[in-house]
Curated annotation (Swiss-Prot):
F-type ATPases have 2 components, CF(1) - the catalytic core - and CF(0) - the membrane proton channel. CF(1) has five subunits: alpha(3), beta(3), gamma(1), delta(1), epsilon(1). CF(0) has three main subunits: a(1), b(2) and c(9-12). The alpha and beta chains form an alternating ring which encloses part of the gamma chain. CF(1) is attached to CF(0) by a central stalk formed by the gamma and epsilon chains, while a peripheral stalk is formed by the delta and b chains. It comes from Acidithiobacillus ferridurans. Coiled coil: none annotated. It is an enzyme of class 7 (translocase). Produces ATP from ADP in the presence of a proton gradient across the membrane. The alpha chain is a regulatory subunit. Its EC number is 7.1.2.2. The record marks 374 as: Required for activity. It comes from the Bacteria. This is ATP synthase subunit alpha. It is a peripheral membrane protein. Belongs to the ATPase alpha/beta chains family.
Length: 514
């Protein structure tokens, strides 16, 4: 039997003592003193930061939002049942982060970047913070590349450029989401990554959007962030910032991205809800004083950044490429009141707005764009040349027609010029109607607008304008493939292409039925 040597035992103990590392982890902790509606009051967190993640019992997290003299006000991220007064809360020393990268494309996630589509975990490349400072003046480049939506009336009258913020505003049930989803569908094959942020919507509505994106093959380049109506106000408040951080991943690496916020009215409501529960002083319409900053700091992050910024950010890996993040925020108005607090705020922050009107929608004019109130403040410089040449008079025709049509209801005898303007306006209105989920190529849009501007529609019955357009495009795409390919490639109407297109339209009119 082997005997233990006492000197060996003492040597082993000495070695263990010498190798012992005393690591002390200091973490500030406090206790919950009150809990109501997902808002915590915590006592004892002395060195907590504003916006810091707080560790709650049961693997949950909170977000510090009010730092007061004797307590901290925080919101619970997610479900708050099971928490009670006296529970211990610990500081984490981290601000909130979400996963970013190409692994998120094709997935549906919540405001924290956690998958909710049942397709397993997301293998994210890296994480980034939710709240970031927007690029400075020197890092930006002017908007001069078109972001085609595939919707004739938008591309012709209120063009959108890459890096622009274009507001979509209107009452409920006027087709706001339809316009945004069509814009996403039109990015197929254009190397633009899309992010759709659903805030405060029914889960069934979001599921319907995801189904349509999958059906049309758009989900492969799209990430959906869902903060449904059933989720806490904190998640609805944070979802747009999470989506913006995911979009900035592409912008900062010299790629192009499109983000849709559907809709920011619900985010403002969620923020008002949180602020009132945190006992912050209410202002106009009971919103807190910083509700303008809530949206401005989000929308200013959508920008076109120059090649120097991209090169510096990627440490020289990407050279000579600009990046862009285009934002389409949606605002829901009440009874067409665009002068309410949140709509006026967002109108002043964005680079233009597409105003959708209930009366036009109910009259069957869809998309229901009001040509007079809709504007694009920077998109004109980015508009495709062919659309700019052909669509210039469309907006004026429509605005004059709407004005004259209202006047003509009371006048019995109209002069010839007025009657012609009204007849032309009727045909242009009919031409700009477009079915949902059917975005058009530049060549198709150009051919349709050419038919209107060249007077080819003047002798077509109003009821036959849409069948005429459909038959004309089918004819051109089958019999004049080279012409349409030339327009699609050059995105301009040269004299040669114009002659060919004019001849093709005349040939179609002389021998086709529609």
């Amino acid at each position: 039997m082997q005997q233990l040597n006492p000197s060996e035992i003492s040597e082993l103990i000495r070695a263990r003592i010498a190798g012992f590392e005393g690591r002390v982890e200091t973490r500030s902790q406090g206790t919950i003193i009150s809990l109501s509606d997902g808002i915590l009051r915590i006592h004892g967190l002395e060195d907590v930061m504003y916006g810091e993640m707080l560790e709650l019992p049961g693997g949950r997290f909170g977000l510090a939002m009010n730092l007061e003299q004797d307590n901290v006000g925080a919101v619970v991220l997610g479900e708050f049942s099971g928490l009670q007064e006296g529970d211990v809360v610990k500081c984490t020393g981290r601000v909130m982060q979400v996963p970013i990268g190409k692994a998120l494309l094709g997935r549906v996630v919540n405001a924290l970047g956690q998958p909710v589509d049942g397709k397993g975990a997301i293998d994210a490349e890296e994480f980034d913070v939710l709240e970031k400072i927007a690029p400075g003046v020197i890092d930006r480049q002017s908007v001069d590349e078109p972001m085609q939506t595939g919707i004739k009336s938008i591309d012709a009258m209120v063009p959108i450029g890459r890096g622009q913020r274009e507001l979509i505003i209107g009452d409920r049930q006027t087709g706001k989401t339809a316009v945004a989803v069509d814009a996403i569908l039109n990015q197929k094959g254009k190397d633009v990554q899309c992010i759709y942020v659903a805030i405060g919507q029914k889960a069934s509505t979001v599921a319907g959007v995801v189904r349509k994106l999958e059906e049309y093959g758009a989900m492969e380049y799209t990430t959906v962030i869902a903060a449904n109506a059933s989720e806490s106000a904190a998640m609805q408040y944070l979802a747009p910032y999470a989506g913006c951080t995911m979009g900035e991943y592409f912008r900062d690496r010299g790629m192009n991205a499109l983000i849709v916020y559907d809709d920011l009215t619900k985010q403002a409501w969620a923020y008002r809800h949180i602020s009132l529960l945190l006992r912050r002083p209410p202002g106009r319409e009971a919103y807190p004083g910083d509700v303008f900053y809530l949206h401005s700091r989000l929308l200013e992050r959508a920008a076109r950044v120059n090649a120097d910024f991209v090169e510096k950010f990627t440490k020289g890996e990407v050279k000579g490429k600009t990046g862009s993040l285009t934002a389409l925020p949606i605002i829901e108005t009440q009874a067409g009141d665009v002068s309410a607090f949140v709509p006026t705020n967002v109108i002043s922050i964005t680079d233009g707005q597409i105003y959708l009107e209930t009366d036009l929608f109910n009259a069957g004019i869809r998309p229901a764009i009001n040509a007079g109130l809709s504007v694009s403040r920077v998109g004109g410089a980015a508009q495709t040349k062919i659309i700019k040449k052909l669509g210039g008079g469309i907006r004026l025709d429509l605005a004059q027609y709407r004005e004259l049509a209202a006047f003509a209801q009371f006048a019995s005898d109209l002069d010839e010029i007025t009657r012609k303007q009204i007849e032309r306006g009727k045909r242009v209105t009919e031409l700009l109607k477009q079915d949902q989920f059917s975005p058009m190529s530049v060549a198709d849009e150009g051919a349709a607008l050419f038919a209107a501007s060249s007077g080819a529609l003047d002798d077509v019955e109003v009821a036959n304008v849409r069948p005429f357009e459909k038959a004309l495009l089918a004819y051109l795409n089958s019999n004049n493939k080279e012409l349409m390919a030339g327009i699609e490639e050059k995105k301009d109407l040269t004299d040669d292409l114009k002659k060919q297109l004019d001849a093709a339209v005349k040939q179609f009119k002389s021998g086709s039925t529609y």
